[in-house]
């Protein structure tokens, strides 16, 4: 199975859940403007998932003459859209927000919410998004009833990206392997990971990266995990009131200490019955973040885009 990041996975779901005729009638480019040449006959849509400050798109958006090149801009969160609006004054009448979503034929949900004394945690994001904080916290936790499995690698973006970038994170991988309460699992493909989330109680994700949405956080909450994370970027929008939030600070040692304290507090929470709250959390994401639901948003949107383009012609 080819490695794939969130953008590639969501594009595959779009093609799975949305009418192919509607997709073929437009041209959708993901994140990086003009990485696919503009189509002179179809409506051109930029599905923007990257942050406004990324070097592969900032100069393009900074030049306002470019803004008319796309018929529509689709953003993955309101947080992301409003950043582009404020930074670049993108045309508001040609922007919309359609969230990322979950393929529930792949995601397996937790069903066992029995109170427990031992908790299993996972870290399932790229190494630069907060792995160093998670490992520093685990280094300070001496409780044998708290363990962390680390699924993190640059391989998610393919062999070329890994060959160019993985070496800088080798010390983190080695540290994960050396800690007695941490298991370094390496790369795990998305489909397999969707079957594993149910086996963990907590997603330990002390994000130090401004997420424009955070698919892994959404999937963890939807599976029925408790999420420990920061309030950075679009995380509060994606995760609502469900996580245990740590106020973000760029003081990494302090953030690690706060995370360790939160982990021990969450461990105590599992001594009680959490079933009702976690099942409500599962129901919330099934209601609003199922690709069957989001796919209808896309179909309605594309139908309107196609009609406008046809009338213009």
Predicted regions, residues:
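Short alpha-helical segment that forms part of, or immediately flanks, the ligand-binding pocket
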Residues: 194, 217-222, 236-237
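Nucleotide-activated donor-binding/catalytic signature segment of Leloir-type glycosyltransferases, i.e.
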Residues: 162-191
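Short hydrophobic beta-strand element within catalytic cores of glycosyltransferases
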Residues: 226-229
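A charged, aromatic-enriched C-terminal amphipathic alpha-helix characteristic of glycosyltransferases
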Residues: 4-9, 250, 254, 271-306, ...
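Conserved donor-binding/catalytic core segment of Leloir-type glycosyltransferases
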Residues: 113-130, 135-138, 149
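Active-site proximal beta-strand in glycosyltransferases
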Residues: 26-56, 71-75, 95-99
């Amino acid at each position: 199975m080819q490695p794939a990041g969130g953008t590639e996975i969501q594009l595959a779901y779009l093609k799975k859940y949305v009418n192919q005729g509607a997709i073929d009638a437009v041209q959708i480019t993901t994140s990086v403007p003009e990485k696919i040449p503009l189509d002179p006959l179809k409506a051109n849509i930029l599905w923007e998932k990257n942050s406004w400050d990324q070097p592969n798109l900032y100069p393009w958006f900074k030049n306002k003459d470019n803004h008319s090149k796309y018929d529509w801009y689709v953003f993955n969160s309101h947080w992301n859209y409003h950043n582009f609006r404020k930074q670049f004054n993108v045309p508001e009448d040609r922007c919309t927000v359609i969230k990322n979503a979950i393929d529930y034929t792949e995601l397996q949900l937790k069903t066992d919410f029995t109170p427990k004394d031992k908790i299993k945690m996972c870290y399932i994001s790229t190494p630069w998004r907060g792995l160093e904080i998670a490992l520093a916290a685990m280094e300070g936790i001496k409780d044998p009833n708290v363990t962390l499995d680390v699924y993190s690698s640059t391989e998610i973006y393919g062999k070329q990206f890994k060959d160019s970038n993985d070496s800088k994170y080798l010390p983190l991988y080695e540290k994960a392997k050396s800690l007695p309460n941490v298991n370094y699992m390496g790369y795990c493909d998305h489909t397999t990971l969707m079957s594993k989330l149910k086996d963990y109680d907590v997603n330990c994700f002390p994000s130090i990266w401004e997420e424009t949405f955070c698919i892994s956080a959404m999937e963890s909450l939807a599976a029925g995990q408790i999420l420990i994370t920061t309030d950075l970027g679009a995380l509060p929008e994606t995760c609502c009131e469900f996580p245990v939030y740590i106020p973000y600070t760029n003081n990494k040692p302090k953030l690690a200490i706060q995370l360790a304290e939160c982990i021990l507090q969450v461990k105590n929470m599992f001594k009680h019955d959490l079933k009702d709250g976690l099942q409500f959390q599962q129901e919330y994401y099934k209601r609003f973040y199922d690709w069957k639901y989001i796919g209808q948003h896309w179909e309605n949107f594309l139908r309107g885009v196609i009609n406008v383009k046809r009338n213009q012609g």
